[in-house]
């Protein structure tokens, strides 16, 4: 084990040594860069760009470009990057992750590779976790880049399309990860290429890279729209589920919250709905509705998981107990609960476009990131993103005191000890940061401190703007700050001058299931060589301890007669906790890896569709593409109607009927003509007739209008079929894990069936486009329209408004319907005369 660790450490050391040589080259250039005037320094940017056009690479320019940025940062920001920051910049430029401890100046470090890569003119994206940090960094570091003659843009959710286009056209764009992903999806839903906002994805530097690529990796970005589905099935499924009995008709696993029909339940369903086989492909929707109705009745409880308020179902947040108005369960569960509670069933939302951060960021030509804690997830970064983690040494040695965990018998004893420790440190004037896993824990400690008369601030992820002020005060004498884990990342706690020799105390009230989050909390203290102390308080009732068998330890504490106020301080327990954390991290990594394998199936399909859409948008003339689609459609139709071996069994009449209905006009192709030909010869005369009809259609209108008509048809069909396909893939994914019970690999099945569904969708697209082109009447006022309005949805944000408005059509009145004027006559005999 020690050998392996040494080996790993040596690899990092070798990288550091190699980068140290480049740092020495940069230092050597300082004497020639320092005497330059501001204008001469700015002129270097143009010089670098010219050298790139003459064949030099960004790697060749690195030492000189870094020296220029260092000098500019000293003049503009009053900050001169240290040698270790130059190393961090080199690691980022090489497409790796720089692990730099809190307070080591990651934001300034990023300016070096950002400047160097922006010289190519292809655009650099600097990615942050929230808009407050994006604006702060764009404003502060933007001064430096603008001084050197580069343009800086900021991409916010509230911006118009034109503002976004301007932000992305800049050399450097600051943005949140959510907004980048949503813009990519929206760009692949637009109907005119002028509406796209992003350029090809060149280079991204992700701040807090572990938060975005690990913690949020499993959360998909979704653009959803209203599905045009009937609510009747929800009512029927609800009525049926009410007749079922627990254990007999369905089984429920309390641990996993998994509920499923038994054999008896399946038989009951087949009888109730008068069908032979519930698992037949044509009953996929019915099975989905029954499963969701079961979940609504068995798993979801009123006033625990949701409340009924003003005739609506409102979700209750399991972590905070707060109501989450406007949020809805997906995949029809919300509608199933509405049916259960007898309130109005609202339309199910339908996924129009979706992507995970894993797949979005893997599309960049080059990707890098920085964080204080990445080494524990090194395997994941290397395997999934092809990025190595390089631990950058600190500028000054760390002198922080990390103490062994204190373990108490009960939660009550633990919290009493935590509060006592805070009170004692507060009296000495030492600033204290208390880290909690959940918001309710922070509120409990807050109440206990209020009773003791200790003034304190609470920091959680609700207010990013206020966050900066609270963090700024957190290092002052006697300050007490309670923070949930992720809150305050990206902002430094700077110590007040009067307590520089004491340092910050960090108290953890519980171990998180990830070592990385614990390390982030520890890293808040002892920044830039300051003193500091960190201490974790645990109890046998903590979730991590409960999950990994602390019963023996609790029994031992009872036998020893230890009460609530006596902690155990044991390296053995700390090691046990750490191995439990490693197990959880391993499970989480496996889950993310599996998610990626499933998501890759949809990714490959998405890339094909988006690439074709792009080609259609940029193409001036689609006629060649459409003729190819018609040829495929005809060949499939011929093969389908002539697949029997005996000629007499061929359905030539069916083929002629199909062609007349979908592609040609009556009499264009005659049955007796086709009977004289072999199957492989039939397609040719049919296609020749199709092209003749296509030419006739061309003569009826100006060429420009015909070309636009083709685009309108292609977009309408492709977008409709693709959204239906995503929905179908969702349903397939939901039920695929059941195949494992039949000793079949669910992933392999998903890949095979997903591919078959995709092939079928392509055939359906080709057929429908051919039919519309040949049979549709062409309107004079042609306009490309969206199939359905999309809205950006990300489970970790409060939902983001879509930029587009739906096209609303007026109600159509049939000629034989009653006239809307109220005369009682039919429309054709009243207001519709002559229409």
Swiss-Prot record:
<feature type="binding site">
    <location>
        <position position="830"/>
    </location>
    <ligand>
        <name>Zn(2+)</name>
    </ligand>
</feature>
<dbReference type="InterPro" id="IPR020937">
    <property type="entry name" value="SecA_CS"/>
</dbReference>
<dbReference type="InterPro" id="IPR027417">
    <property type="entry name" value="P-loop_NTPase"/>
</dbReference>
<dbReference type="InterPro" id="IPR044722">
    <property type="entry name" value="SecA_SF2_C"/>
</dbReference>
<feature type="binding site">
    <location>
        <position position="821"/>
    </location>
    <ligand>
        <name>Zn(2+)</name>
    </ligand>
</feature>
<feature type="binding site">
    <location>
        <position position="819"/>
    </location>
    <ligand>
        <name>Zn(2+)</name>
    </ligand>
</feature>
<dbReference type="GO" id="GO:0005829">
    <property type="term" value="C:cytosol"/>
</dbReference>
<keyword id="KW-0811">Translocation</keyword>
<keyword id="KW-0862">Zinc</keyword>
<feature type="binding site">
    <location>
        <begin position="103"/>
        <end position="107"/>
    </location>
    <ligand>
        <name>ATP</name>
    </ligand>
</feature>
<protein>
    <recommendedName>
        <fullName>Protein translocase subunit SecA 1</fullName>
        <ecNumber>7.4.2.8</ecNumber>
    </recommendedName>
</protein>
<dbReference type="GO" id="GO:0046872">
    <property type="term" value="F:metal ion binding"/>
</dbReference>
<keyword id="KW-0067">ATP-binding</keyword>
<dbReference type="GO" id="GO:0005886">
    <property type="term" value="C:plasma membrane"/>
</dbReference>
<dbReference type="GO" id="GO:0008564">
    <property type="term" value="F:protein-exporting ATPase activity"/>
</dbReference>
<feature type="binding site">
    <location>
        <position position="492"/>
    </location>
    <ligand>
        <name>ATP</name>
    </ligand>
</feature>
<dbReference type="InterPro" id="IPR014001">
    <property type="entry name" value="Helicase_ATP-bd"/>
</dbReference>
<dbReference type="Pfam" id="PF01043">
    <property type="entry name" value="SecA_PP_bind"/>
</dbReference>
<dbReference type="InterPro" id="IPR000185">
    <property type="entry name" value="SecA"/>
</dbReference>
<dbReference type="InterPro" id="IPR011130">
    <property type="entry name" value="SecA_preprotein_X-link_dom"/>
</dbReference>
<dbReference type="InterPro" id="IPR036266">
    <property type="entry name" value="SecA_Wing/Scaffold_sf"/>
</dbReference>
<dbReference type="InterPro" id="IPR001650">
    <property type="entry name" value="Helicase_C-like"/>
</dbReference>
<dbReference type="GO" id="GO:0031522">
    <property type="term" value="C:cell envelope Sec protein transport complex"/>
</dbReference>
<keyword id="KW-0547">Nucleotide-binding</keyword>
<comment type="function">
    <text>Part of the Sec protein translocase complex. Interacts with the SecYEG preprotein conducting channel. Has a central role in coupling the hydrolysis of ATP to the transfer of proteins into and across the cell membrane, serving as an ATP-driven molecular motor driving the stepwise translocation of polypeptide chains across the membrane.</text>
</comment>
<keyword id="KW-0963">Cytoplasm</keyword>
<dbReference type="InterPro" id="IPR036670">
    <property type="entry name" value="SecA_X-link_sf"/>
</dbReference>
<comment type="subunit">
    <text>Monomer and homodimer. Part of the essential Sec protein translocation apparatus which comprises SecA, SecYEG and auxiliary proteins SecDF. Other proteins may also be involved.</text>
</comment>
<dbReference type="InterPro" id="IPR011115">
    <property type="entry name" value="SecA_DEAD"/>
</dbReference>
<dbReference type="Pfam" id="PF07517">
    <property type="entry name" value="SecA_DEAD"/>
</dbReference>
<feature type="binding site">
    <location>
        <position position="85"/>
    </location>
    <ligand>
        <name>ATP</name>
    </ligand>
</feature>
<keyword id="KW-1003">Cell membrane</keyword>
<keyword id="KW-0813">Transport</keyword>
<keyword id="KW-0653">Protein transport</keyword>
<dbReference type="GO" id="GO:0043952">
    <property type="term" value="P:protein transport by the Sec complex"/>
</dbReference>
<keyword id="KW-0479">Metal-binding</keyword>
<keyword id="KW-1278">Translocase</keyword>
<dbReference type="Pfam" id="PF02810">
    <property type="entry name" value="SEC-C"/>
</dbReference>
<dbReference type="Pfam" id="PF07516">
    <property type="entry name" value="SecA_SW"/>
</dbReference>
<dbReference type="GO" id="GO:0005524">
    <property type="term" value="F:ATP binding"/>
</dbReference>
<dbReference type="GO" id="GO:0065002">
    <property type="term" value="P:intracellular protein transmembrane transport"/>
</dbReference>
<dbReference type="Pfam" id="PF21090">
    <property type="entry name" value="P-loop_SecA"/>
</dbReference>
